[in-house]
């Protein structure tokens, strides 16, 4: 007999956890749509030569290739060592680039899309790291140009999503890559690849600490003078406290910009984002400047975002993204700038569960169980269930008569809030008895008013 087991690096949930996960997906989708984003789905696998625009490197080592058994046998016979034709997507950005380039003349720009699908990476399986996981992305793609105003709107989307998820206080930290590039240029760190390497080291500041970054930058491979490294560390230590302080920090930076045009541009862009965020109604307690935010991916060119939970910094980033200049350069001659974010929901859910922050979420999608007292009551139980479902109540029927205590136990274990009972006495009076397991109380209500009464109870519990 084969031992049942799940593959390492996957997140398989029991029904009550799956319901909580699904509700988080629903909240994210609802907020994406409120801001006018359109749904897109792409195939789980892409053509290998389309997906892997860069040969070799860490990305290719983590890609899962797809090959039929027939193709595998043919390759073995012929000695063909070329890459399989298909590969599983490792993020949603590359498929988006292919999608926009392929459908460029059918889409309306700026193109606002959201995508919530699983992606696959062959990482080493360990706690909190997954090989299969959900990403929930939004992007606004322009043609030739895209206003920085969209950067502010994306920040407002982040705020709306995590406000409704109600998983605790959070902070949206933002920066602009142009600030860092301009500042480094003023220190003489202007070479393209060298500057990107420094940015990647700075991005490790929160995880590895200032001493590690200092030692790396003065050491072999960088050899930046200690005095300049201290200036870099002082720059990336900047954090704003409130909206007015954020604008003041930018004003100070602008005054010290000297001849750096790129730094001035970054200041102007970030200032406009801050002003529009305030107009969008995002409270100043929800965001701050953090000049250490660089984002490891090299294609970010302007605004960058990192979102963290205030009371659980150990969880790390729960949402990140930024501005890029040319999404589909590998697939199209058109310039397609954009701005977007991604929520890695599988990892976030796992971290929240580990931190005990999922416990308060209602446990079942079934709202009512119609109990069965005896065989003769089956038609009445089915009629009550029909009425409840017609009234919008998710309802399960007990199909075999059992002791009422066991039916209560079943409902409690399954996370069902209401148990509806209709014995001979209740039927004779045209009422049903309802046991509310959440409030631990029982009441009677007319059969005609049952569904509306339960709807009111459910709505009231949402407000509590």
UniProtKB/Swiss-Prot annotation:
The gene is hisS. NCBIfam families: hisS (TIGR00442). It holds the Pfam family tRNA-synt_His. It is found in: Cytoplasm. The keyword ATP-binding applies. Its EC number is 6.1.1.21. One of its GO terms (biological process) is histidyl-tRNA aminoacylation. CDD domains: HisRS-like_core, HisRS_anticodon. Keywords: Aminoacyl-tRNA synthetase, ATP-binding, Cytoplasm, Ligase, Nucleotide-binding, Protein biosynthesis. Belongs to the class-II aminoacyl-tRNA synthetase family. It catalyses: tRNA(His) + L-histidine + ATP = L-histidyl-tRNA(His) + AMP + diphosphate + H(+). Transmembrane segments: none annotated. Gene3D superfamilies: Anticodon-binding domain, Bira Bifunctional Protein, Domain 2. InterPro entries: aa-tRNA-synth_II, aa-tRNA-synth_II/BPL/LPL, Anticodon-bd, Anticodon-bd_dom_sf, His-tRNA-ligase, HisRS-like_core, HisRS/HisZ, HisRS_anticodon. Homodimer. One of its GO terms (cellular component) is cytoplasm. This is Histidine--tRNA ligase. It is an enzyme of class 6 (ligase). One of its GO terms (molecular function) is histidine-tRNA ligase activity. It comes from Stenotrophomonas maltophilia (strain K279a). The lineage of its organism: Bacteria, Pseudomonadati, Pseudomonadota, Gammaproteobacteria, Lysobacterales.
């Amino acid at each position: 007999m084969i031992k049942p087991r799940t593959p390492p690096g996957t997140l398989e949930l029991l029904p009550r956890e799956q319901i909580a996960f699904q509700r988080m997906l629903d909240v994210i989708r609802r907020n994406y749509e409120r801001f006018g984003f359109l749904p897109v789905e792409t195939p789980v696998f892409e053509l290998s030569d389309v997906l892997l625009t860069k040969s070799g490197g860490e990305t290719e080592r983590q890609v899962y290739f797809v090959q039929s058994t027939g193709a595998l046998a043919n390759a073995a016979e012929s000695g063909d060592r070329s890459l399989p034709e298909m590969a599983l997507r490792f993020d949603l950005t590359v498929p988006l680039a292919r999608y926009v380039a392929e459908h460029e003349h059918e889409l309306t720009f700026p193109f606002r899309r959201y995508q919530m699908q699983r992606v696959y990476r062959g990482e080493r399986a360990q706690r909190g790291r997954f090989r299969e996981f959900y990403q929930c992305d939004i992007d606004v793609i322009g043609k030739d140009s895209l206003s920085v105003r969209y950067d502010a709107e994306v920040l407002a989307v982040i705020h709306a999503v995590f406000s409704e998820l109600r998983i605790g206080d959070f902070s949206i930290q933002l920066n602009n890559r142009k600030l860092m590039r301009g500042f480094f240029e003023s220190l003489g760190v202007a070479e393209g690849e060298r500057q990107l390497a420094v940015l990647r080291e700075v991005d490790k500041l929160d995880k590895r600490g200032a001493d590690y970054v200092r030692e790396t930058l003065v050491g072999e491979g960088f050899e930046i003078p200690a005095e300049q490294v201290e200036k870099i560390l002082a720059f990336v230590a900047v954090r704003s406290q409130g909206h007015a302080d954020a604008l003041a920090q930018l004003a100070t930076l602008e005054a010290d910009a000297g001849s750096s045009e790129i730094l001035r541009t970054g200041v102007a862009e970030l200032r406009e984002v801050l002003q529009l965020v305030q107009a969008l109604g995002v409270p100043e307690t929800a965001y701050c400047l953090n000049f250490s935010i660089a984002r490891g991916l090299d294609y970010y060119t302007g605004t960058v975002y990192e979102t963290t939970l205030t009371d659980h910094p150990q969880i790390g980033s729960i949402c990140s993204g930024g501005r890029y200049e040319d999404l589909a350069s590998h697939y199209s001659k058109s310039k397609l700038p954009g701005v977007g974010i991604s929520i890695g929901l599988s990892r976030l859910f796992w971290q929240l569960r580990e931190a005990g922050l999922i416990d308060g979420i209602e446990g079942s999608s079934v709202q009512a169980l119609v109990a069965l007292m005896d065989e003769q009551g089956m038609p009445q139980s089915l009629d009550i269930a029909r009425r409840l479902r017609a009234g919008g109540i998710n309802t399960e029927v007990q199909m075999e008569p059992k002791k009422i205590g066991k039916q209560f136990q079943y409902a409690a274990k399954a996370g069902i809030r209401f148990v509806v009972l209709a014995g001979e006495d209740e039927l004779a009076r045209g009422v049903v008895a309802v046991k509310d397991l959440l409030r631990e109380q029982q009441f009677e209500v007319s059969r005609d008013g049952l569904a509306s009464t339960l709807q009111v109870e459910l709505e009231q519990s949402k407000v509590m």
